[in-house]
Amino acid sequence: METSSVLTRGAARQRSPAAPEKQARDQTERRPGRRRQGRRINEDQEEEAVFREVVSFTPDPLPARYYDKDTTRPISFYLSTLEELLAWTPLMEDGFNVALEPLVCRRPPLSSPRPRTLLCHDMMGGYLEDRFIQGSEVQNPYSFYHWQYIDIFVYFSHHTVTIPPVCWTNAAHRHGVCVLGTFITEWQEGGRLCEAFLAGDEPSFQAVADRLVQIAQFFRFDGWLINIENSLTPAAVRNTPLFLQYLTAQLHQQVPGGLVLWYDSVVQSGQLKWQDELNDQNRVFFDSCDGFFTNYNWREDHLQRMVAQAGERLADVYVGVDVFARSNVVGGRFDTDKSLELIRKHGFSAALFAPGWVYECLEKSDFFQNQDKFWSLLERFLPTHSICSLPFVTSFCLGLGTRRVCYGKEQAVGPWYHPSAQETQPLFGEHKLAGDSRGWVKTHCCLTDAWHGGSSLLLRGLIPPEVDSVAVRLFSLHIPVPPKVFLSMVYKFEGSTDVQVALELTTGDASSCHVGGMLVLNETGSRHSPRPLRVPPTRLARWASSCGQQLSGGWIQRCYEVNLRGCLLQDLLVSFSRPPGSREEESFICRLGEIQVVDASSLLAPLPRVQNVTISQIRWLPLITGSEGLPTRLLLSCTLHWSYLLLRARCFRIHCWKRTGSSSSVAESPETEKPTFLGLAFANQYRVVDLAVEAAGFGQDGRVEFLVEPVPREGFLVPQAEWGKAVLLFSVPQ
């Protein structure tokens, strides 16, 4: 680990803010406000960074754009002016807002001619609890989890440059959904802004386009909705198609799969005049970018006229649907299916504006029921897409809960909301057996119990006497599978039951697909049920040691290893079968806590280690003051940075150990104690906020050890010895 020269507190924004401890030790009395770093090798020959800090209650201010002013928690942000946009350049703090999740491979690709579904998220001005990058403690937050039904997610607000909060990009990308920000100008001020960059020469609008592309590329979202809702001068409107063409071309170069969409507002004369359709007055903008988002007051005759206008680009016309049903619109609210029926009849894509109506206008206590009702009414008009890459791992966590659970063990109690932590969600709804059978299975979110995170998947169903089993398809996949695949399912039944649960999968390319270790369930040979492993293979024991065992919280894990050659994995199903010999009607309630599908060879590859953990941007606040007027307890806030190959990580769990009263800088960590969980990070940095610690006495060091636990994409626990570590030693001024 390289170290730099001693830095002042004002330079703490740099990534490596300290000097070797032995060089700085003699400078402590002369420079009591400075921080020092050293290295030591512990008994296990692991390198550990040590930082020294003299407590001060006058920290340097943090840049307001990036941090909540009251707590210093990192926040997502927007830009309000053209000057802010052109001046933007990435700082260290911008790293908090960079998406960890790449856009996963999906089928069909977004570029296919199939009509698409766009969700435009407009909720109460935007940047609500979702702005807190590391999550927040809020009850009954809004959540979206029907990702398999949508293709594009637009984050909308009335700020000039709406950069999507990173939590939405992480959640959407995990489901193969691309994310767009919004560039909007409105009213007289918007007209002046447009005049400033569109009415001039080519470099003026190219500079704006370049900056929009750089922002999308840096924060790892996928493009922009351009919404000019003010009149344009002749010079400005003349340059607008050129601006769109340049922006689209540059975005396609820098952001693979990137999109630029134009909202139906200004016409080619420069007049602000919504058309509710694509026509000759606005076609020039459609021809200059990737798609056209219509206004909402259309009728079927608008759709009929647009068929000829769009030609081969029907899917690039996104017909707007205001879910709030404001003004003179078709459908909306729980009648939104009427809008979609007409849109799909004519082959267009759909743009659902503000489907958060179910949260904003209906009872919060009934949110999940209303959310499921809303999307179930639209289901027949919403083609799904398939994920086509491994590893495929999900605990069904919604990114929220009333407590946190880590592999069956309760970690913290209290409400939390962290959308970046939302894991891949299944196909929700009611699934009935074909024909006259009365068998069914319903899938729901379950916040009352969890294996990992804050929720699980609840499956309720009925096996009628005339059939032996019922099954529900949870995931649509399109994965060319490797020769050997490891699968795992964690589940529990509610109450006593003899019903059996099994994981099933379907494969494509049946003629060339050779399967080992599975039962064939249908005549075509495409549906299979893996045989559970009683004992995991020795080479996988580190990851699958609990197979077949009862786990914490009453959960059970089943593991499978299957041999495949020339196969395409298409669907994951869960089936429920009646007890042998029984012909009674059987009902069941089952919770799924996790499903894993992993290339077995990837489990044998060595994982990278968390390295170079640093501590900077320290802030102290007195919490409790003793009889002598000195603080006895403190609140510590600081920023951790580390190095790790992010492509290998699902996230990082941050922990700490606290100790006071040691006069030795090499005091051992309380290895026998369980570290305190602080939070989740979806970047190579984390802001610790208001951590309560005991103040150190005169001549003593307080000690906090921070631990960074990597969570690999395969979803297994990493031994604590392989976590990253950094120690903060703090003392009172002499």
Swiss-Prot record:
Q: A single Pfam family, by name?
A: Glyco_hydro_85
Physiological role: Endoglycosidase that releases N-glycans from glycoproteins by cleaving the beta-1,4-glycosidic bond in the N,N'-diacetylchitobiose core. Involved in the processing of free oligosaccharides in the cytosol.
Q: What is this protein called?
A: Cytosolic endo-beta-N-acetylglucosaminidase
Q: Where is the BRCT domain?
A: 281-375
Ranges for region Disordered: 1-45
Where can this protein be found? Cytoplasm, Cytosol
Q: Which UniProt keywords apply?
A: Acetylation, Cytoplasm, Glycosidase, Hydrolase
Similarity field: Belongs to the glycosyl hydrolase 85 family.
Question: Which species is the source of this protein?
Answer: Mus musculus (Mouse)
